[in-house]
Each structure stands twice: as C-alpha cells, then as structure tokens.
C-alpha cells in the first residue's frame, strides 16, 4: 500500500496526466480511490471512492473525462464494493452489504435498476466478475464451508448494448 500511495504522490507532484485534485470532477482526489475495474472497450473505469465522506461506486468516462450518474446504485444504508463492469459499462456487478449481509447485485445503467442476484444464498459471497456481454456473472461463495466459484447465466435476452 505504501508503494501505491508513494506512486500516487509522485504522480501528483510531477503534474502528470493523472487528475490529482480534490475536485468532484477528477478521476483521482485526495480521498481513497480503490478497487478499479476497466470496461472491455477501455472507455470506462468503475471504482470505490470515499469522496465527501461517503463510500460508494463511481463510474468515470475516460474518453470524455467525466463521471457518469448512477441513480439508485449507491444507497446510504449499504456498503458497495468490488465493482466489475461489462464491455460498455451498461452493467455493473458488485457486492452490497446491508442488514449485516453481503449480496451480489447487478446495476443496469439503461433501466437504472438494481437486481439482487444472491438473495437466499446461504453463506458469504465475494469478488463478483461480469462477462463482457453482461450474460455471465461469476463470484466466490462460502456456502459449502469453503470458498467455491459460482456462475450465473443471465440468458441471451439482455446483452451489453446501450
């Protein structure tokens, strides 16, 4: 962690391409930015940030250098972590913890809806990952007393098209 912080501080001091201000419109800020996920087309990056004292998932458009609104994704009563995004960032899969339980959730930027994918799972879930087209979601589950891999097939109806 010290190396990452050191690299960030050096980059900020040398005024490189990284945006290193406390601005709400910059990729990086003086607050914690972690758990990055890059879209398959390389245009978007989703990550967890602690800006304004609120921990949540942000989506940044690298091409247009601006944040994308994510209505209904971040809730004040839940902690969102470990984002993974589809090819065009239409879908964001992540872990949300509320009511003392972690669930894998899927956010659709087009419909602005959140779907809980692991409701009713026994045990813990962590580290979700989504396929480029948004059809498959993998994650780790501890429901059998050890960490195992699960795959959810969402079918062919909804593909990653904006």
Model-derived features: where do they sit?
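Sequence signature of WD/YWTD-type beta-propeller architectures
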Residues: 10-162
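Sec-dependent bacterial lipoprotein signal peptides
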Residues: 1-12
């Amino acid at each position: 962690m010290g190396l990452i912080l050191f690299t960030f501080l050096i980059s900020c001091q040398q005024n490189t391409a990284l945006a290193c201000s406390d601005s709400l419109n910059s990729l990086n800020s003086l607050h914690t930015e972690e758990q990055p996920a890059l879209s398959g087309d390389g245009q978007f990056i989703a990550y967890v940030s602690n800006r304004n004292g609120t921990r949540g998932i942000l989506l940044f458009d690298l091409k247009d250098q601006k944040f994308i609104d994510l209505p209904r994704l971040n809730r004040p009563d839940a902690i969102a972590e470990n984002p993974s995004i589809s090819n065009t960032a239409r879908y964001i899969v992540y872990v949300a913890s509320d009511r003392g339980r972690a669930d894998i959730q899927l956010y659709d930027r087009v419909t602005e809806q959140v779907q809980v994918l692991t409701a009713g799972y026994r045990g813990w879930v962590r580290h979700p990952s989504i396929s480029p087209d948004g059809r498959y979601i993998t994650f780790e589950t501890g429901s059998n007393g050890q960490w195992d891999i699960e795959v959810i097939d969402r079918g062919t109806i909804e593909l990653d098209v904006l």
